[in-house]
Structure formats: C-alpha cells, structure tokens
C-alpha cells in the first residue's frame, strides 16, 4: 500500500520528498548534497546515473 502522502499529491520538504514518501511522480528539487555531489540535473537522473545517490534521490 502506497504511503498516504503519495496517494493524491507529493509533499515536498527541503531536500526532497517528505520523510517516508518515496513516490516516483514526486518532482521535488534535488537536495544540496545531490546537486553538489553529482552532475545530474534532476533526482531522477541522479538515481539512474550516480552510484551512491543521496536519500532524497529514491
């Protein structure tokens, strides 16, 4: 069963999705660690490209 925060909408917090919310349709901005630690422009790219994506790149 999906997390309640992902059923109707994405809930963003600084650094990515709200804690516990791992929704593929979420379009939160990458966190500082992601944007500074890898060259990916989106967390989706980070997840696919980087070997060790941070927690906001599910």
Curated annotation (Swiss-Prot):
Write out the ranges of the annotated region (Beta): 1-29
**UniProt binding sites for a divalent metal cation 1:** 5-6, 17, 21
Copy out the induction comment: By cadmium.
Q: Which UniProt keywords apply?
A: Cadmium, Metal-binding, Metal-thiolate cluster
Q: What is this protein called?
A: Metallothionein
Q: Does the keyword Acyltransferase apply?
A: no
Region of interest (Alpha), ranges: 30-58
Q: Which residues bind a divalent metal cation 2?
A: 6, 10, 23, 26
Q: Which residues bind a divalent metal cation 5?
A: 34, 38, 56-57
What this chain does, per the entry, is described as: Metallothioneins have a high content of cysteine residues that bind various heavy metals. Class I MTS in marine crustacea are involved in the sequestration of elevated levels of heavy-metal ions.
